[in-house]
Amino acid sequence: MSAYCQVTGRKPSFGKSVSHSHRRTNRRWNPNIQRRTFYLPSEGRSITLNVSTKGLKTIDRDGIESVVAKIRARGEKI
């Protein structure tokens, strides 16, 4: 899935667009996904993650090592 955050698990949300005449059509709101490369000092290599902007704040707060450990605990391969 392209619009999926590997850190927070955010996915597109769905809803309706409502026009001036109140006609409703389906639409989706995509999360703000950024493809970022992070260096893991413990492994001596870089990894590339698809992360939302909220996921970037999580990495800044908790550190890349602990975030990668949580992703691997969920069973995702990095």
From Swiss-Prot:
It comes from the Bacteria. Keywords: Ribonucleoprotein, Ribosomal protein. InterPro entries: Bacterial_rp_bL28, Ribosomal_bL28, Ribosomal_bL28/bL31-like_sf, Ribosomal_bL28_bact-type, Ribosomal_bL28_sf. One of its GO terms (biological process) is translation. GO terms for molecular function: structural constituent of ribosome. Pfam families: Ribosomal_L28. SUPFAM superfamilies: L28p-like. Residues 1-26 are annotated as: Disordered. The keyword Ribonucleoprotein applies. The keyword Ribonucleoprotein applies. One of its GO terms (cellular component) is ribonucleoprotein complex. HAMAP family: Ribosomal_bL28. PANTHER family: 50S RIBOSOMAL PROTEIN L28 (PTHR39080), LARGE RIBOSOMAL SUBUNIT PROTEIN BL28A (PTHR39080:SF1). Belongs to the bacterial ribosomal protein bL28 family. This is Large ribosomal subunit protein bL28. It comes from Corynebacterium jeikeium (strain K411). The gene is rpmB.
